[in-house]
């Protein structure tokens, strides 16, 4: 009985020092060397993460340059579009100031046009738009009774659509510019740090075990953020998390600034294009619900409505016919330029979305390192410390020859990884395999939280 008890105590003691059944003792020196090698691998992965951040920084800067070029094109297109709109409004004003001609002819046609237009529009709405037909019908009746054939004759609906489109486009660009400028100032501050402009020093410095435990600065020692956050001596224990946290906070702030505008009402209903028969029904439905002007798009389906558009008043007033031609020409130019502007605006929005996506990647690259660094509260010199190595025999529950290694990443909870039989403890890749699996396990756990 006494022999059995002594044997059990001996096994416990050897377990504490790293020895396991079926294998020779793993000495403290071996555990330290394993920790040393594993820490080198973790250090390399941190360096890779930082290099990845720098690559994303380059992409963000490239995207921003493309955005600036696109914005310049937008401003040029906006000026041309507004000039065309001004010409259209001037032609419309001149046409309205002329004494009415052909009024009797147009009024007679208008009275026959209205019932057909209403019936055609309500059939379309009931079939395609479906919701709220009763309210839309009453709204349309009022709209048609208040409209004049002259408004119809000079394409007033197209002019109104242009002006509404211009208002929405201006608002959308203002919203994007406002939020991007906020994000941009944060990004600029982030990237001005010397960490992004110089190669960082090696993050891991191997010290004799007799010296005080410490870690060197991860970022360049004279970095603005390191300098402001860590005014203490470089020989004091390093607050690793404090170096990453400002970056994460700034990235999150930039993301919030970029995300706001994509959820604003302006982006839920972007400016409409000039839709002809057979085009986007959803936009027509929205216009009908908004102010009934969408129904005027269906004028080509009613004979009497088409006749109004073809009324020729040049015999009675040649100047009116001339002004109408000028109005039609300026209207076509304004519509074409507005379509072009809308395409540029969409491209600009895609650039904004791309920047937002790159910020998400930037956050992902920094986040796992920061979360890992957040665990670093002690003065242990190792990024990865090996606490137990167990090589299993055929008597254990684990397959024979497999090695179980328990490690800690900084001050994390212990992580157990298994190393296959073909990678023995003497294999140079042994600790690289252990560290790689430990980081994978850590990242997996982090994603699941």
From Swiss-Prot:
Q: Where in the cell is it found?
A: Nucleus; Cytoplasm; Mitochondrion membrane; Cytoplasm, Cytosol
* Residues modified as Phosphoserine: 133, 396
What InterPro entries does this protein map onto?
A: Clusterin, Clusterin-like, Clusterin_C, Clusterin_CS, Clusterin_N
Q: Which cysteines are joined by disulfide bonds?
A: 102-313, 113-305, 116-302, 121-295, 129-285
Residues with attached carbohydrate: 86, 103, 145, 291, 354, 374
Q: Does the keyword Ubl conjugation apply?
A: yes
Q: How does it sit in the membrane?
A: Peripheral membrane protein
Q: Where is this motif: Nuclear localization signal?
A: 78-81, 443-447
Q: Which SMART domains match?
A: CLa, CLb
**Molecular function via GO:** amyloid-beta binding; low-density lipoprotein particle receptor binding; misfolded protein binding; protein carrier chaperone; protein-containing complex binding; protein-folding chaperone binding; receptor ligand activity; signaling receptor binding
PANTHER family, per the entry: CLUSTERIN
Q: Which family is this protein grouped under? A: Belongs to the clusterin family.
- Name of the protein described by the UniProt record: Clusterin
Organism of derivation = Homo sapiens
């Amino acid at each position: 009985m006494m022999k059995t008890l002594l044997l059990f105590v001996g096994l416990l003691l050897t377990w504490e020092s790293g020895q396991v059944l079926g294998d020779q003792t793993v000495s403290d020196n071996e555990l330290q060397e394993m920790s040393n090698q594993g820490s080198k691998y973790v250090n390399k992965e941190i360096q890779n993460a930082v290099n990845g951040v720098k690559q994303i920084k380059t992409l963000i800067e490239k995207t921003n340059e493309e955005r600036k070029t696109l914005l310049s094109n937008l401003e040029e297109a906006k000026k041309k579009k507004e000039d065309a709109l001004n010409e259209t409004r001037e032609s419309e004003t001149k046409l309205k100031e002329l004494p009415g001609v052909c009024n009797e002819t147009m009024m007679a046609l208008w009275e026959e046009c209205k019932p057909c237009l209403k019936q055609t529009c309500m059939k379309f709405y009931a079939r395609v738009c479906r919701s709220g037909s009763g309210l839309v019908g009453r709204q349309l009746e009022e709209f048609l009774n208040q409209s004049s054939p002259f408004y119809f004759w000079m394409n007033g609906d197209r002019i109104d659509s242009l002006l509404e489109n211009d208002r929405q486009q201006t608002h959308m660009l203002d919203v994007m510019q406002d939020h991007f400028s906020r994000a941009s100032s944060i990004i600029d501050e982030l990237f001005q740090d010397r960490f992004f402009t110089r190669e960082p020093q090696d993050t891991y410095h191997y010290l004799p075990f007799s010296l005080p435990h410490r870690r060197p600065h991860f970022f360049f020692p004279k970095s603005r953020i390191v300098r402001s956050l860590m005014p203490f001596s470089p020989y004091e224990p390093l607050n690793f998390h404090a170096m990453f946290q400002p970056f994460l906070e700034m990235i999150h702030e930039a993301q919030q600034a970029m995300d706001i505008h994509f959820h604003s009402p302006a982006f839920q209903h972007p400016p409409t294009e000039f839709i002809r028969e057979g085009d986007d029904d959803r936009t027509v439905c929205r216009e009908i619900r908004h102010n009934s002007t969408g129904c005027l798009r269906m004028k080509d389906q009613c004979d009497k409505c088409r006749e109004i558009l073809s009324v020729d008043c040049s015999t009675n007033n040649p100047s009116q016919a001339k002004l109408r031609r000028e109005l039609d020409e300026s209207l076509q130019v304004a519509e074409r330029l507005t379509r072009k502007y809308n395409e540029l605006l969409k491209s600009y929005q895609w650039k904004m979305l791309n920047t937002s996506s790159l910020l998400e990647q930037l956050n992902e690259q920094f986040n796992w390192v920061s979360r890992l660094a957040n665990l670093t509260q002690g003065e242990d010199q190792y990024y990865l410390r090996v606490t137990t190595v167990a090589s299993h025999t055929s008597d254990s529950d684990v397959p024979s020859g497999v090695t179980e290694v328990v490690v800690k990443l900084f001050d994390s909870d212990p992580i157990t990884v298994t190393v296959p039989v073909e990678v023995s403890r003497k294999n140079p890749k042994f600790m690289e395999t252990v560290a790689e699996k430990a980081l994978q396990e850590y990242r997996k756990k982090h994603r699941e939280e």
